[in-house]
């Protein structure tokens, strides 16, 4: 299990295994810890992280959009050198996932 912060300040946990990575997005007022029970339950690599302004990831601007959240994911998966991902979202995380799919559909497996 890797606990780290990427070059843009996003805190994440990574359980490196095989297959296409599964990325979990938490909801408002929560952080990556909501997904702790899932991180070891998959044969695939699992990535959990703190969305902007939550947990250990700072918010460095006054206004934020769904595009900012989607850009956060693309920056993180690019840095980790993930080509395609599976994306799972809860609450606002599902809206972020929908936005990500609109902007970066070529990076989604499911």
Sequence positions of predicted segments:
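Conserved hydrolase catalytic core segment
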Residues: 83-110
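Alpha-helical elements of Rossmann-like donor-binding domains used by nucleotide-donor carbohydrate transfer enzymes
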Residues: 11, 34-37, 41, 68-75, ...
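Aromatic/acidic, Gly/Pro-rich catalytic loop(s) in extracytoplasmic/lumenal soluble domains
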Residues: 1
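A short loop-to-beta-strand scaffold at the N-terminal edge of the catalytic core in hydrolase folds
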Residues: 4-15
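Active-site loop/oxyanion-hole signature of alpha/beta-hydrolase fold enzymes
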Residues: 37, 47-88
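Conserved HGGG/HGGXW glycine-rich cap/lid loop of the alpha/beta-hydrolase fold
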Residues: 14-58
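Active-site acidic short loop of glycosyltransferases
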Residues: 17-19, 44, 78-84, 105-106
